[in-house]
Amino acid sequence: MMTDLKQSHSVRLNDGPFMPVLGFGTYAPDHTPKSQAAEATKVAIDVGFRHIDSAYLYQNEEEVGQAIWEKIADGTVKREEIFYTIKLWATFFRAELVHPALERSLKKLGPDYVDLFIIHVPFAMKPGKELLPKDASGEIILETVELCDTWEALEKCKEAGLTRSIGVSNFNHKLLELILNKPGLKYKPTCNQVECHPYLNQSKLLEFCKSKDIVLVAYSALGSQRDPQWVDPDCPHLLEEPILKSIAKKHSGSPGQVALRYQLQRGVVVLAKSFSQERIKENFQIFDFELTPEDMKAIDGLNRNLRYDKLQFAANHPYFPFSEEY
């Protein structure tokens, strides 16, 4: 993926559509009122975001969809200007559950198609109504579903016109190869959405994805929201990093803007997540400055392979993605 950031704010996916290089993430911890997701999405569209990232797991698809439709109804945007992503959750990986899961999400959202439908994590969980099905001892119940079967079901969703593109999330290079080497593959993943920030810069995975014409999409690009359900609260705060602060000062910006701009200049599509009106505006203002090669090198040097979202509960699953180097 290469794009001239001065000329274009989007990148062409390997199956044709364009994806805006800066997206708005809609995940929020359980204690956040769902109405905030709707309000924040409307603010994001007002300030210029056209790439909206949601998921069944976030349990706010209806609110986010409603916000998008309100902005279409008031003339701020047209549907074709919005790039909307949703994700297949781990309890729906069996092939026969994929199409109904997407249709359910579409019903909540209102549109008759999404722009991108991605496998949220590579490991499956026991099907059912629970987001995180647990056994009597409180352990999450995982199951093994062949990823290639799930992928084939996504291909059928694309062929049925329910989604324009299909992709994956939280895959390592070996899991990507599993899909890429699938006999009878019709469509390869357009993207791999992973945790990516200066403390975990994913340089090897980025090179691998570029070599396969797969776009790397960064989540937790500003560090993490530190939801205790997923993240160790003792992890260092990325935006307190002195090197990011000094580079930000030089460019009259914020550490968050530097962290986002860093990804764009590496050829990574980046998601920014905030429910604060001021921060949403600030996060969009990353197209009017450029980091120098020295800045980029200094930020590269911050990598410490620090993963905020470890998904440790799935460590023994055969498709657990984080036991490989990349």
From Swiss-Prot:
Entry EC no(s): 1.1.1.-
Protein's name in the database: Aldo-keto reductase family 1 member C8
First-level EC class: oxidoreductase
Entry keyword annotation includes Lipid metabolism: no
Keyword Oxidoreductase set for record: yes
Residue(s) at site: Lowers pKa of active site Tyr: K87
InterPro entries: AKR, Aldo/ket_reductase_CS, NADP_OxRdtase_dom, NADP_OxRdtase_dom_sf
Pfam families attached to this UniProt entry: Aldo_ket_red
Site, as annotated: Important for substrate specificity: L57
Residues engaged in binding NADP(+): 25-27, 53, 169-170, 193, 271-283
Binding site for substrate: H120
Catalytic residues identified in the record: Y58 (proton donor)
UniProt keyword terms in alphabetical order: Cytoplasm, NADP, Oxidoreductase
Listed GO MF terms: oxidoreductase activity
Compartment(s) where it occurs, according to its Swiss-Prot or TrEMBL record: Cytoplasm
PANTHER family noted in UniProt: ALDO/KETO REDUCTASE
Cellular component terms (Gene Ontology): cytoplasm
Family: Belongs to the aldo/keto reductase family.
